[in-house]
Amino acid sequence: MRTNRILNIICPPILFLLVGFLFGCVREDIESDMNETSSLFLQVQPYNQRSEEGGVAAYDENTIERLTLVFYKNGTKVWQAEPVETSPSSNSYYVPVPESMYGQFNGNNSFKIYLVANVNFSGSFEPNASETSFLKTLVPNSILLQNDGKPEDKFAMIGSVEKQINMATSEGKQLGSIELKRVAAKLRLKKPVLNISDYELVGDPKAKFRNCMPKGFLSVEEKPEGVGYEAIDYRPMTEANSSVHFYSYYNEWALNNEGRPEFVMMLKLKKTGTDDNTAKPYYYRIPVDGSDKKIRSNHLYDMAVTIEVLGSLNEEDPVTINGSLSVIEWTSHSDDQTLPDVQYLEVIPQETVMNMTTEIELDYFSSHSLLPPADVKATCTYVNSNGQQITDTYTGANVPTVTIDANTKKIKVRSILPINNIPKDISFTIKNSIGFEKKIKIRQNPSQFIINTFGTKSSWQPEGNLAPNLNNKAIYQIVVLSPPADGNMIIGFPPTKEVGFYKKSGSSYTLKHTDRITEQDEQTANMVSPSFELASQLGATLVQDHWEYYTLNPLRLIYHSNQQNRYALMTCAFYWEERKKADGTIERLDDWRLPTRAEIQLVDKLQREQAGVVRDIMTGRYYWSGLPDKAIKILLPTASGNATEQRAHVRCVRDVKNDRFVKSAKRLKK
């Protein structure tokens, strides 16, 4: 049985154009204008495979309807020609050369020759005289999908070669090889793996695509000015077609993710054992976020997802989940094809994540045999209780093993799960016998782990100075991929409710501020956000009451303009903290809340574990949760201070709903 394998090589051809004066291959019935002494000949040999799953049609992704050759000398256009096919479906072409070009094609001039497929250069739409302008031609081909999954137009493709042409010699007429690549990129979402307890799928999953760039330049990586994004409507993932695909021209987006492409997936889910007509549509947002924040020509952005939480019932506010994204050259070859005679090495993927697993397999493709893996190491990076960033290197059995299977073309990585509550960063180098190499990076996450960023200032410390005896500006992030086996922890974003803060004058109340606080019920108290951040010590407080109010029904909380007089609920409602992002911009975080009881207990458990390396996160004796009756006791042996069940410390938290490591959970509704 034929199986398709994705291939990414140094020169990954979609199709090779073999251009030459083919004396032994010229047919006797070629039309009269094809003269062996005055024509260039070329052979188009398409590789008709694509990066696809079995049973999926090719969607005209390799179809060539017309070819245009454009010749440039020193950046100026000198000639344009359309190759003529010698006979239908022969893939053999010739290019008659007019006598006016013989003086140019004399063996002394070097030409940059561009081959363009499926672009209709006619009338006023001619290749520009300037080579720079030609490469910035706005491609007219539409990539928006029709009902059959094919784009409205055939794919524009481009390739080039540099050559000195000499019409006086046979060798001088051979232009060599041209690699032809699509101008557009392909984005594919595979059918999801469903792993939600007590729920099952009804019907086919559907997905649509947002922030498609509908226009692009022929061979320049820029977004065209004045061209807006398009949205492509839902398409189903059926049994016959276990994925959906979309296309886009070059796109790039800023660190704030404006313009980032994304899939929106709809699943109809029902409770196990109930009728199909009880199923409801749940919506998920799946960002396509490559490390370089670009969608590049002739690349396949292949997304796989596992669904472990309920989505949103609101299509306009879908739950964000992060899938496994592979970015590879958009081409493939089946096992029974002969690969071109080129040198290459590719490992897929080069960067990936191992969540709660001790083994992973990577695919590799190499023109030559591989050498043993080199530079295998594993590290972990964390911030200790003194605010110092530490990187430890693993030794002994904690160093991963990397093995290569030349028969299956697999690289197997085995690594013991970290027990120190910190992700393990694995790296190694793969080389082949001719010196090509790939550096591999893998992050291995345990079921619960801690990462961090750093705060710079806060509403409590607007100058950015820590209070006396404090030294840690780390904003710790707690990530829960899987709850403990005891079954007592409920994973999900804790629900919140809106409340008002008032000033009272006589018998009248003036609303000064509204905000959202953690729900104050027992079910919420047992919940743990799948990903939440704790305010740094820039937000450390003295002991406070839980709340102050004028009335309970309706709830009217007391407003204090002086933060030194505030209570726990108000402290988190009004708290903000800033940090510097990777691009140097400042991010202000102002969506804080009181933690749940279970979240405080989880942090306390992690900081007390003997193997853990992040300790002393919450060091007071008691901390307020969302429950008003009494504060939560910290079991850390070194906990100190004057906090009690009724007057306790405050450590605000915030949910991280667009997490780069963990699938986000649905915010539970009241």
Swiss-Prot record:
GO terms for biological process: cell-cell adhesion. A lipid is attached at C25 (S-diacylglycerol cysteine). Gene3D superfamilies: 2.60.40.3690. One of its GO terms (molecular function) is host cell extracellular matrix binding. Disruption phenotype: Triple mutants lacking FimC, FimD and FimE show strongly decreased interaction with host CXCR4 and impaired down-regulation of the TLR2-mediated innate immune response, resulting in strongly reduced survival of the bacteria. Belongs to the FimD family. This is Major fimbrium tip subunit FimD.
